[in-house]
Amino acid sequence: MSIDATAGGAGRTIRDPTNGEEITFLETAAESGEDRLVIRLTLAPGGAVPLHAHPAQEDFECLEGQLAFHLAGQAIELSPGSTVTALPGIVHGFRNVSGAPATLRIVATHGAEMEYGLRVKVAMMQDGAFTSAGRPKDLLLGSVLLHRSAIYLAPMPVWLYRPLIAGLAALGRWRGREQVLRTRYPDYVRLLDAVHRRERGT
């Protein structure tokens, strides 16, 4: 994973060359007290974030370029100054449809889980663990991460996806995949800590 280091030692900008995605952390979870995350996301021409849903709310503002945004089955065109909100659990995704880079400013709740989940996902993409479409090559390894992150990938029906991912994640943990994540990706341990803190209400 390509990282630009900050004075504090954490990567302020992470890049995924497989899909032309660049994420700059404008306000990290640590800086917000874990309540929120603010990022700037830049997509290369044709770059896309596939349809998905998660427990966090995201507020999007288009800063440059043109994007085709899909929200709960509706198609929305975003241009500079346009905004859209994806509420928790609502399926959304977007694609850069311009011939130049497109940039979004995104404010998300569940800051710690969102940040560390993004960091692990991009690191795994760099390692070749995911396809450019965001699908895990090792189903058990990917399922453990998706389950811990509470990420839903469309278009599989939610009623089928959730028990399937839970079952695959349980099998993955039994087969040692979670230990692989813990060993290779320090941010995965931070993700687990954030999930446990939320579950305890602390």
Summary of predicted features, one role per range:
Residues M1-N19, L26-R36, A48-L51, P55, ...:
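Jelly-roll (double-stranded beta-helix
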Residues V38-T42:
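Short amphipathic
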Residues F60:
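Structured binding elements
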Residues L63-E64:
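A cytosolic small-molecule/anion-sensing beta-strand core signal
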